[in-house]
């Protein structure tokens, strides 16, 4: 009679007749609702077993069910891949499952669809790969601790679309984290790691292990779409080194929200080396805190987005830089938040919005690339009560050499300059400070009760445009310097000031127009609000070139529909106008029913006759 031999082969392991050899054996545990740390349960599957599978063995859960573990276990490799299971360690003593396979082959642990409740998973200092590719989702909860990991990877080797949730006061301890550790030859990504419910991720690696990634080894910028979502009170992620959100990849998101916090030595939002692409990576902080401790925040690639709402961002104790110098067309939106940092370096195409009366935006940079940097296409908006008051000590020269940039101050926001030595408001120049430093085709908008003020304000440069739409531009200072210059210095040319809406306001000691400037009023449909006067200057009006050849006064009444004969005050001065100045105002080209008049030698008014009302007859 031949002796029956039972052979199981896995990873080169051989089990003969149910007894262990020196090689690893593979054991499938298929007992529904079973305890895979119970020898008697194993014997129902493998009757000849005399001890539990151990550090030379591969344990594989082979059924869609709930499993428990009633004592600590150490195995070579562990898997519930391709099954939907619940590992209910919490109800069976919160014991430790130690997985010891080295950093070769499959790296010890496989998980696809399932829930792990409580207990400890100890990776013995090795890498831990979860293989959460498309359609697979695992939840770790109820205080489960995943510990002693070298590299922790949610997805690897070109897999995409998986989700891993770390919830319920759980813990992850590793040297480094990879949401997606892809392949240079395969497009991959769209991986989610959610950390919530008071859970904590602690990454403690040094050297090469000090770098954690949303996406590494991706295919030349084509991979991406990974999300690290940290949210909820008490939820934290602490990185001893650097976190890179978007390494050679695109559209990756780091979100910190709802009382959660993220700390790292440094943070990169987008990163690339020569020849590699990265774009559209995002940092979203919504009611959360992001801090760096020892290094800066750096953004790279086109279209980076920073979105902060009720947030705190602190860069290296408030002294570190935020560097966007390699991030063209970045969008930064800061609302009701605290930003504590040092230098703020920008790149062309910046779109920066700072909003909220309680927002603190502490940076050493004062110009956001719109000083004498030659920047093209930057846009800055101060909004919703935010007050920006840079302290410079030599005046604020904005848009000196920039082109097609814009500054918008609106909805109760304030832009002003401060001289710390004199403890006074300082001068603000828009558009250049010399014939060799000229800003061109820039726009300054003051809207919806927004406010710009300084000791002296000047619009200069070439073809720059100041638009006051129900906003206020005013000067505060000594009579000798309290003035607004609309076209300052003989190298200015083609600038324009437009007053729009029912309550546009210029308030200055003196108003000066010159060097090819257009002063334009756009009268709204119903005219100005009661008692509203767009320009008031108690110290008078002055035209730099008295022959008026270069300057233009315009009044656009195309929207104005007076219901009766109407008089609107456009400007009121505290000193008499000269005959040349009167002629300049009266020279505006207007339709027949409108004309400019000078009242008491000091007030410029627009008079309008109501259009004759005819009878309309309809014959059917």
Predicted regions, residues:
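Asparagine/serine/threonine-enriched low-complexity, disordered tracts
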Residues: 106, 133, 155, 180, ...
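Feature marks extracellular polysaccharide-active and adherence modules
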Residues: 62, 70, 76, 81, ...
């Amino acid at each position: 009679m031949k002796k029956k031999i039972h052979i199981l082969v896995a990873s080169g392991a051989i089990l003969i007749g149910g007894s262990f050899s020196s090689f690893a054996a593979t054991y499938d545990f298929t007992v529904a609702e079973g305890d895979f740390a119970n020898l008697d349960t194993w014997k129902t599957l493998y009757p000849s077993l005399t001890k539990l599978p151990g550090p030379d063995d591969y344990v594989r859960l082979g059924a869609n069910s709930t499993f428990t573990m009633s004592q600590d276990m150490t195995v070579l490799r562990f898997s519930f891949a391709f099954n939907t299971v619940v590992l209910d360690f919490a109800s069976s003593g919160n014991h430790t499952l130690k997985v010891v396979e080295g950093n070769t082959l499959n790296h010890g642990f496989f998980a696809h669809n399932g829930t792990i409740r409580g207990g400890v998973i100890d990776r013995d200092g090795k890498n831990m790969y979860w293989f959460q590719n498309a359609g697979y989702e695992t939840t770790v909860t109820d205080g489960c601790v995943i510990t002693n990991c070298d590299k922790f990877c949610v997805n690897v080797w070109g897999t995409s679309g998986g989700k891993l949730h770390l919830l319920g006061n759980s813990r992850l301890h590793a040297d480094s984290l990879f949401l997606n550790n892809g392949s240079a030859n395969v497009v991959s990504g769209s991986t989610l790691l959610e950390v919530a419910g008071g859970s904590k991720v602690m990454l403690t690696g040094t050297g090469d292990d000090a770098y954690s990634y949303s996406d590494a080894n991706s295919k030349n910028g084509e991979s991406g779409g990974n999300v690290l979502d940290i949210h909820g009170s008490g939820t934290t992620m602490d990185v001893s080194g650097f976190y890179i959100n978007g390494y050679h990849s695109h559209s990756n998101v780091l979100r910190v929200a709802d009382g959660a916090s993220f700390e790292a030595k440094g943070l990169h939002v987008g990163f690339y080396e020569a020849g590699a692409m990265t774009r559209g990576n995002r940092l979203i902080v919504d009611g959360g805190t992001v801090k760096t401790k020892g290094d800066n925040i750096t953004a790279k690639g086109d279209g980076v987005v920073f979105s902060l709402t009720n947030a705190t961002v602190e860069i290296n104790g408030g002294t570190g830089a935020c560097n966007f110098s390699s991030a063209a067309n970045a969008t930064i939106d800061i609302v009701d938040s605290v930003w504590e940092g040092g230098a703020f370096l920008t790149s062309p195409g910046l779109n920066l919005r700072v909003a909220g009366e309680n927002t603190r935006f502490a940076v050493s940079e004062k110009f956001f690339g719109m000083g004498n940097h030659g920047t093209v296409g930057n846009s800055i908006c101060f909004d919703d009560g935010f007050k920006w008051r840079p302290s410079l000590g030599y005046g604020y020269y904005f848009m000196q050499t920039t082109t097609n940039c814009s500054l918008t101050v609106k909805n109760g926001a304030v832009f002003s300059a401060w001289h710390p030595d004199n403890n006074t408001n300082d001068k603000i120049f828009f558009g250049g400070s010399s014939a060799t430093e000229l800003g061109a085709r820039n726009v300054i908008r003051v809207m919806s009760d927004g406010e710009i003020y300084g000791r002296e304000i000047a619009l200069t440069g070439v073809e720059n445009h100041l638009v006051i739409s129900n906003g206020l531009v005013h000067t505060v200072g000594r009579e000798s310097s309290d003035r607004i210059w609309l076209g300052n210095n003989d190298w200015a040319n083609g600038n324009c000031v437009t007053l729009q809406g029912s309550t546009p306001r210029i308030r200055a000691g003196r108003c000066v127009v010159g060097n090819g400037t257009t002063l334009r009023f756009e009268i709204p449909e119903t005219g100005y609000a009661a008692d509203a006067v767009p320009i008031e200057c108690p110290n008078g009006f002055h035209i730099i070139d008295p022959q008026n050849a270069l300057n233009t006064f315009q009044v656009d009444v195309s929207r104005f529909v007076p219901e009766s004969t109407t008089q609107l005050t456009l400007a009121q001065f505290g000193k008499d106008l000269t005959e040349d100045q009167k002629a300049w105002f009266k020279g505006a080209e207007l339709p027949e029913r409108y004309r400019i008049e000078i009242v008491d030698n000091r007030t410029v008014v627009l008079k309008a006759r109501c259009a004759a009302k005819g009878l309309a007859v309809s014959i059917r």
